Amino acid sequence: MAEITAKLVKELREKTGAGMMDCKKALGESGGDMEKATEWLRQKGITSAEKKSGRITAEGLIHSYIHTGGRIGVLVELNCETDFVARGDTFKDLVNNIAMQIAACPNVEYVRVEDIPEAVAQKEKEIEKGRDDLAGKPENIKDKIVEGRIGKRLKELSLMDQPYIKDQSITVAELIKQTIAQIGENIQVRRFVRFVLGEGIEKEEKNFAEEVAAQTGQKVEQPQAAQETAKVEPPTPETVEEVEPPVTPPAQETDSPAAETTTEPPKTTPVDKPKGSPSKKGKKKK
C-alpha cells in the first residue's frame, strides 16, 4: 500500500475540489491510486458537493415531523439555492429523513461540531479529565486519552456526524453530499429544534382514582382494612417490653373441686307419707 502523503492529498483535493479529510480517506480506500480515489469520491457524491458548498442557500423548507404517538416533535430548516429544488420530491424526502434522524437522536443538540460553544466543549473536557480510570496516569498520556474521548463526545452532539438511520454505512453529512451531487445545488441544514412531551416538567405522582376524584371534587375513601393497616405501626423493642400479656377471665367456681372431673349420682329426697294412711306394720287385726 502506497504511503498517503500530504502532497498526494493536496493533489487530489485540487483535482476534485473535495475536502482534505475526504481526499485522505479516498486515497486510503484506493491504496493511494489517484484515479481510483477520484472514482471513490464521485461514487460518494463528494466531488461536486465540495465545489458547491460555498454557494448561498437562501431558499428551502421549514419542515415539521411528529413521531408516532405525538410525544416527540421536530422542526428543521433545510436550505437550498432555488425554490424549484425546494419544491422537488428529492429535497422534500431529504428534509423529512433529516427530521426523522433528529427525532431518533436524543443526544444531538447542534448541526455540526463547529457549532458547539467553547464553554460546552471545555465542560465536557473537564468531565473526562475527572474520570476515575485516568487517576495516576502521566499528564501527557492523560491529555491524549482526553482528546480522543472529547472528540468522540462532541461528535455525539453533532447531527452531521450521526450514522444515517436508514443506512448506517454513511453519516448525515455524506447523505447531504450525495443529494447535492444528485440535484446539482448546495444544501445546508441551518437549524433545528427537538421537542419531547413533558420534558423539564416535574410530574406529580397520582393514581387513577385520585385523578378522577380531583376532577369531580369527591374524596376518595380508602377501604376500612387499608385504613387500619395504615395506622398499625411495627413494634419496637421499647413497645414490646411494655406490652402486658392478655388477662384470662377466671373460671366459674363450683361447689366441689372434684366436680369438674367426677360426676356424682343425684341424691334422692325422701317423700313424706300422707297422714292417716296406716302402715302395714302398725295395722291391728280385729
Swiss-Prot record:
Residues 215-227 have a biased composition (Polar residues). One of its GO terms (molecular function) is translation elongation factor activity. Gene3D superfamilies: 1.10.286.20, DNA helicase RuvA subunit, C-terminal domain, Elongation factor Ts, dimerisation domain. Transmembrane segments: none annotated. Residues 212-286 are annotated as: Disordered. Residues 253-269 have a biased composition (Low complexity). SUPFAM superfamilies: Elongation factor Ts (EF-Ts), dimerisation domain, UBA-like. Residues 82-85 are annotated as: Involved in Mg(2+) ion dislocation from EF-Tu. It is found in: Cytoplasm. Keywords: Cytoplasm, Elongation factor, Protein biosynthesis. InterPro entries: EF-Ts_dimer_sf, Transl_elong_EFTs/EF1B, Transl_elong_EFTs/EF1B_dimer, Transl_elong_Ts_CS, UBA-like_sf. Pfam families: EF_TS. Associates with the EF-Tu.GDP complex and induces the exchange of GDP to GTP. It remains bound to the aminoacyl-tRNA.EF-Tu.GTP complex up to the GTP hydrolysis stage on the ribosome. PANTHER family: ELONGATION FACTOR TS, POLYPROTEIN OF EF-TS, CHLOROPLASTIC. Belongs to the EF-Ts family. This is Elongation factor Ts. It comes from Gloeothece citriformis (strain PCC 7424) (Cyanothece sp. (strain PCC 7424)).
